[in-house]
């Protein structure tokens, strides 16, 4: 939950994820509500049309274009959504943009969203992402446990 993330970062924010930037808190909250209520709903129906009996997954895909364009416009001003470095807002949104792209990479990559794609690919190609998204073999209860430190 975003409330838990905010609480944790108010307690300890070593990477300045709560930095002030071009957006005020009301604007940030509005973006997160749009992500939670609209974008994710349409993403699920685009990604899993059979689960939702959706006959037109492209309809739900296209409903998210307005949000993607809005993010692209924000990224024209910075390398991140709110300030010059990635912040809580970026980390809250990036996984869902990645999921959206993964449904149809060719279609997504053909979109005229230069800044959004640059932002996404910089994250996907980062050491930070590689360290947290490392692939492991299917867990077997008889194997030695794997411990990670998620350092990057």
Where are these regions (language model features)?
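Alpha-helical packing segments of well-folded alpha/beta enzyme cores
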Residues: 63-67, 71, 96, 119
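GST-like domain detector, emphasizing the conserved glutathione-binding G-site
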Residues: 1-66, 76-79
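Surface-exposed helix-capping loop/turn segments at secondary-structure junctions
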Residues: 73-84, 128-133
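GST superfamily/GST-like fold recognition
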Residues: 81-106, 123
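Structural signal for well-ordered, non-membrane alpha-helices
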Residues: 40, 68-72, 124
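Acidic/histidine-enriched, glycine/proline-rich intrinsically disordered or flexible terminal extensions
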Residues: 136-152
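Acidic, serine/threonine/proline-rich low-complexity intrinsically disordered regions
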Residues: 54-59, 105-112
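A contiguous, mid-protein "functional segment" used to position or interact
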Residues: 111-138
